[in-house]
Amino acid sequence: MPSQTTLKRARQAARQGKRPTTQAGEFVREEMEHIRQGKHGARSTKQAIAIGLSKARRAGIKLPPPRLGQVSEKTRQSAKSAYRAGQTGQHRKPSARRSRSTLKALKREGHKAATRSALARQARAAARRRKTRSAASKG
């Protein structure tokens, strides 16, 4: 469950007319904080970002799932169901056993995913994949 401050910041960004990706960024930032604080870990920076985006979609941020061919079909379906859950407002009570096992698995993972160097590496790689709008993609 996202914290109240994260929800407040995301709503404020929405009021200011910011893009859904900007609003979702708050949830990703919170996820990185959780990893840094040691609440849990993540296998990779990509996984940490994915968790944040999923939470954003479930919280009702209008961030559509990625298009066909961008990511694996499993990821797309997961994003689709998270998006649908956030938009309909109907939430089933999460299974305690499933939540516990997920958290337990994440606790076993490392904390390197949220370091400055890991985030910088991820940002550079993402910029390189973009065809336009970045110096990194040109270099």
Q: Each PLM stretch: what is its role?
A:
Residues M1-G139:
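A charge-rich, low-complexity, intrinsically flexible signal that marks solvent-exposed coils, linkers
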